[in-house]
Amino acid sequence: MGRTVIVLGGGISGLAASYHLIRGPSPPKVILVEGSKRLGGWIRSIRGSDGAIFELGPRGIRPAGALGARTLLLVSELGLESEVLPVRGDHPAAQNRFLYVGGTLHPLPSGLRGLLRPSPPFSKPLFWAGLRELLKPRGKEPDETVHSFAQRRLGPEVASLAMDSLCRGVFAGNSRELSIRSCFPSLFQAEQTHRSILLGLLLGAGQSPQPDSSLIRQARAERWSQWSLRGGLEVLPQALHNHLASKGVTVLSGQPVCGLSLQPEGRWKVSLGDSSLEADHIISAIPASELSKLLPAEAAPLARILSTIKAVSVAVVNLQYRGACLPVQGFGHLVPSSEDPTVLGIVYDSVAFPEQDGNPPSLRVTVMLGGYWLQKLKAAGHQLSPELFQQQAQEAAATQLGLKEPPSHCLVHLHKNCIPQYTIGHWQKLDSAMQFLTAQRLPLTLAGASYEGVAVNDCIESGRQAAVAVLGTESNS
């Protein structure tokens, strides 16, 4: 009888793991278990009555690098090529990003000319920060905060404005707590290998082999900065779900796992309330802190490690305006914590993907609120209600973008514990977890955003790697 592998979690990581498990030469029986009623995790797209698409989670995927190429290959394999909406390299959403500082939108400098010119909010041309960086010695610590790393190598302004904002945009987190080694491994490795970030990025880490397809070649030729799908990004997990169902994968949704136990013969028993399943191996693609509550007593040391990987909550407010215009054209803007801790940034959805504006076309923007700073709002006595988030989002859109008329449509969603925080020393937690799994020969593989990347590409790759580890061979991709 063949092996049975249970995949916990029907987000994009669990779906990708299941997809690659069944592509091996001798695929196991795969059972995907999801606690909620829907699959796709944080990727969720809602279509308005006018046909406009509102993304409640991720809204674009980067095609760059080996991981970006692998995701595009997946899109082709699922037959979604005709649905792809690219943002080409010459598009304003690819070229223009802004910081909101001192009550003003400032374009981030790009290209050599931009680096040589004074570019507010920075007091000097960023060329000087780059020159300073080239002359700095290599750091000696095995890890440090993003803020400390950026301040040491690039100066206080880049640290407190650019890197602070970037951490808020990517992780909804505090650069003074997040780990440079785990959050931005390419920057950490560049310094370790070449003594300089700039030298490291220029010389590169060597080209890793990349998959090839007509879509990948097109993305490269047209220098895509990101892409989406015509019906919204949720089309991707939906297509994966349909593919899995067609290949005989058992998909159980609305089935929260109550506990995991090891049988005497080494198989897993997965308790689902009033029923249970058995498996030879488990791939866990649920958050680390959730898995820590399910593990049996034999895995208590692992549970303790996983319970320390925390996540923050983000309020996402989608706003739609009739007959309104943006003061600038670009991807969006970020807000450093020194300016407005509550507002992380605003994405200009209609600039990147006007095809999703509906009929008649409208202006769509998305305001991100909270993250690490949500706990401070709560501590200050604020009731974290949809009304509060809508008010804060509309005020931000009015103040920062001049959108003073009330929106014609508004969606408010609080995503609880949606973005894991790789705080300083995160790499040691991962090392300890892997050492425990290896030493105990536990038939458990970890995947998902809790470990080595929170972006969609990272999650898809973590699912693929988990499947490869279980199969003991590369899947057919």
Curated annotation (Swiss-Prot):
Cofactor (UniProt): FAD
GO MF entries: oxygen-dependent protoporphyrinogen oxidase activity
GO BP field: heme A biosynthetic process; heme B biosynthetic process; heme biosynthetic process; heme O biosynthetic process; porphyrin-containing compound biosynthetic process; protoporphyrinogen IX biosynthetic process; response to xenobiotic stimulus
Name the record gives this protein: Protoporphyrinogen oxidase
EC number: 1.3.3.4
Cofactor remark from the record: Binds 1 FAD per subunit.
One Pfam entry name: Amino_oxidase
Origin organism lineage: Eukaryota, Metazoa, Chordata, Craniata, Vertebrata
Predominant localisation class: mitochondrion
Transmembrane segments: none
Encoding gene per record: Ppox
